Amino acid sequence: MRIVFMGTPEFAVPSLRSIAAEHNHFELVLVVTGSDKPRRGRNAPSEPSPVKSAALELGFQVYETDDVSSSDFLSVVADSAPDVIVVAAFRILPPEVYGQAKLGAFNLHASLLPAYRGAAPINWAIINGEKESGVTTFFLQKTVDTGNVIMQEKIPVLPDDNASILSVKLSHLGAELVVKTLRSIQAGTVEVQAQDDAFFSRAPKLTRENTRIRWNQPVAVLSDFIRGLAMKPAAWTTVQNRTMKIFRAIPFTEEITSSIEQPGSILVERGRFLVRGSDGWLEVKQLQPEGRKPMEGAEFARGFRPESGTSLLFE
């Protein structure tokens, strides 16, 4: 069975490696990925995608593109004569591309569809306090993330999982599911299920605006928001007119004598860096001030001497 694989970030690499390991059953004829990205520095070489690096290491032919609608790309896919196209964290493909696969084209999505359709399912699942997540394979169709579900696998979202940790877990779970899906397609035993839109939810693209911390929320909500964006792109706020990224923060449960109730207020208490939410205090455990390296909250607290009631800026 001839396979074309399409993916770009680290999330897609385990799936690529799992397909490659099944070389006695599947023929991986082409790997498609995004173009190399320029690095900072005058003469710095461009940076290949994680999928490109892995594919070259494994000895596969790689085609780079940022334009999946071009006639050149369509010709490359058609010339590969794929039985199946596997997509993992790539671009939205036009029907002219995925229609080239004789047995179908499917996508690996990092949620339990129809929940969290969109660009950032891992982040929004944690932000919304979900206790369970998973991966889905589904056949591509014109409307994004709405195709018939082939297979799903679930895992719990643990209290200490952030977006980076959960992404690694789901990438490996997804790699197993991709191989199971390919075996089912090859055997002709695929059974699909239409998505029930009654359970639909969105996972929109992360932006500068929707990753800003709004401190006038309960501390449990704030904690989930912060871990849902860690380590990249990271939740952010401003303090003394400078941006600060916050990677980890937990509800502070010890007794505090302070009478401060204004959300966003800072308190350095017993060497800890605390910020007021709407219903209590949040201890900032890991952060990165603008222009500095990431550090522990306690380290920042030792050198930070705000006036009583100094507030982080928030809207």
UniProtKB/Swiss-Prot annotation:
Is rRNA-binding set as a keyword in this record?
A: no
Record-linked Pfam families: Formyl_trans_C, Formyl_trans_N
A molecular function (GO) held by this record is: methionyl-tRNA formyltransferase activity
Which residues make up the binding site for (6S)-5,6,7,8-tetrahydrofolate?
111-114
List the EC numbers from the record: 2.1.2.9
Q: Spell out the GO cellular component terms annotated for this protein, sorted alphabetically and separated by semicolons.
A: cytosol
Q: Broadest EC class?
A: transferase
Q: Identify the keywords attached in UniProt to this record, alphabetized.
A: Protein biosynthesis, Transferase
What reaction does this catalyse? L-methionyl-tRNA(fMet) + (6R)-10-formyltetrahydrofolate = N-formyl-L-methionyl-tRNA(fMet) + (6S)-5,6,7,8-tetrahydrofolate + H(+)
> What family classification does the UniProt entry report for this protein?
Belongs to the Fmt family.
**Chain's role:** Attaches a formyl group to the free amino group of methionyl-tRNA(fMet). The formyl group appears to play a dual role in the initiator identity of N-formylmethionyl-tRNA by promoting its recognition by IF2 and preventing the misappropriation of this tRNA by the elongation apparatus.
List the protein's name.
Methionyl-tRNA formyltransferase
Which organism's genome codes for this protein? Chlorobium phaeobacteroides (strain DSM 266 / SMG 266 / 2430)
